[in-house]
A protein has these predicted regions:
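Helical-face signature of the major facilitator-like transporter fold
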Residues: 12-16, 122, 156, 164-168, ...
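A gly/Pro-rich, aromatic-decorated transmembrane alpha-helix motif that marks the paired
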Residues: 208-220
Length: 221
């Protein structure tokens, strides 16, 4: 097929963008500041908060409710509207951060846990890059890419079953094992499909896709 090598590099660029979206999800959703408009009792669109003595009932746009003591919330005015800000995210959803911690203690705990997860992810990622290079040489790029994508796809699915720091770290390590393969795999693929005078361009497109994934991750997530 004429020009098939360019279709191949486009597909590799696509999975590379997805790769970096996957990688960034935990970082951007680990702890998030969610704004709630203080309501006078009327249901409003979007997130809103109802005062209940010393607590606020936080109502998400999807109807989910959460009761939080007012001391745990940040109150401010935005565009002439009173709002409260609640810290949420994966770390809180998994119960990894105690609600009794102060804001400074909670921030430190969240940072330390994310750092631990990232370290183990990168250990798995580095080991996989060494092993994947040999694997792709042995079984070829088609099978190699298939194994890598299946592995990190399974890691993504299993991450939804995480129930604590240990399981989440394990699934992130699995993600690292799967995500690392395309780097040596792309180098091999470019050598197989592109003439020598076009290989630098192909490799540059691959690198640009990695940067693009990092750029759009915070926008999409």
């Amino acid at each position: 097929i004429k020009g098939i090598r360019w279709w191949i590099i486009v597909l590799i660029m696509l999975i590379t963008i997805i790769n970096y979206l996957d990688r960034g999800t935990l970082n951007y959703m680990w702890v998030t500041n969610i704004e709630y408009v203080i309501s006078d009792g009327q249901t409003t669109s979007g997130n809103y908060a109802l005062k209940d003595n010393d607590n606020y009932i936080l109502v998400k746009s999807n109807g989910d409710r959460l009761t939080v003591h007012e001391s745990k919330l940040i109150s401010k005015e935005k565009n002439g509207v009173d709002i409260v800000i609640n810290k949420e995210g994966i770390a809180y959803d998994l119960g990894l951060i105690s609600p009794d911690l102060s804001e400074e203690e909670a921030a430190k705990a969240a940072k330390d846990m994310l750092g631990t997860i990232t370290i183990f992810f990168m250990i798995a990622y580095g080991i996989s890059q060494l092993v994947s290079g040999k694997l792709y040489d042995k079984i070829g790029t088609r099978k190699g890419f298939s194994i890598s994508v299946l592995l990190w796809g399974a890691a993504d699915a299993l991450t939804s079953l995480s129930c604590g720091l240990f399981s989440l770290t394990g699934f992130r390590m699995m993600l690292g094992l799967g995500e690392a393969g395309p780097w040596p795999g792309t180098t091999k693929s470019n050598a197989e499909w592109f003439p020598q005078k076009e290989r630098a361009l192909a490799q540059g497109l691959f690198g640009a896709a990695a940067s693009l994934g990092s750029i759009i991750a915070p926008i999409i997530i």
